[in-house]
UniProtKB/Swiss-Prot annotation:
UniProtKB keywords: ATP synthesis, CF(0), Hydrogen ion transport, Ion transport, Membrane, Thylakoid, Transmembrane, Transmembrane helix, Transport
Family: Belongs to the ATPase B chain family.
Name of the protein in its database record: ATP synthase subunit b'
InterPro entries xref list: ATP_synth_b (IPR034679), ATP_synth_B-like_membr_sf (IPR028987), ATP_synth_b/b'su_bac/chlpt (IPR002146), ATP_synthase_B_chain (IPR050059)
Flavoprotein is among the record's keywords: no
Length: 143
């Protein structure tokens, strides 16, 4: 069935030569390309990790700055509100003092006018009383 003549060793030799040729022409360049690609992927992955770490650090730093800025702005707002309340209280107190002063001035003027009116009424009452006495009693009896 099988002949063991020179074809079998020749085929074996062809197989070995073909294996060496395929290895030299196809497998080594392909392995080189695959290794270069793996190195390229590994390098890019490391760069991406570094960039991601830097981005996270920068993001964290910016978030901290935003938090600090918010705190500062809230403090500024609180200070401004306190200052506004203080100024409003001062203005209200000043207005109340001015109102009280005007009220006292008006009360003094009213009292002065009242006293003046009472004084003039007393004089008029005295004059009218004298006139009534003159009319009732006559000018001779009054002296």
């Amino acid at each position: 069935m099988f002949d063991f003549d020179a074809t079998l060793p020749l085929m074996a030799l062809q197989f070995v030569v073909l294996a060496f040729l395929l290895n030299a022409i196809f497998y080594k360049p392909m392995n080189k390309v695959l290794d270069e690609r793996a190195d390229y992927i590994r390098t890019n992955e490391e760069d991406a990790r570094e960039r991601l770490a830097k981005a996270k650090a920068i993001t964290q730093e910016y978030e901290q700055q935003i938090t600090d800025a918010r705190r500062q702005s809230q403090a500024v707002i609180a200070d401004a509100q306190a200052e506004a309340r203080r100024l409003a209280a001062e203005k209200i107190a000043e207005a109340q003092r001015e109102s009280q002063r005007q009220k006292e001035t008006a009360a003094q003027e009213i009292e002065a006018q009242r006293q003046s009116a009472l004084s003039s009424l007393e004089q008029e009452v005295a004059a009218l009383s004298n006139q009534i006495l003159h009319k009732l009693l006559g000018p001779e009896l009054i002296k």
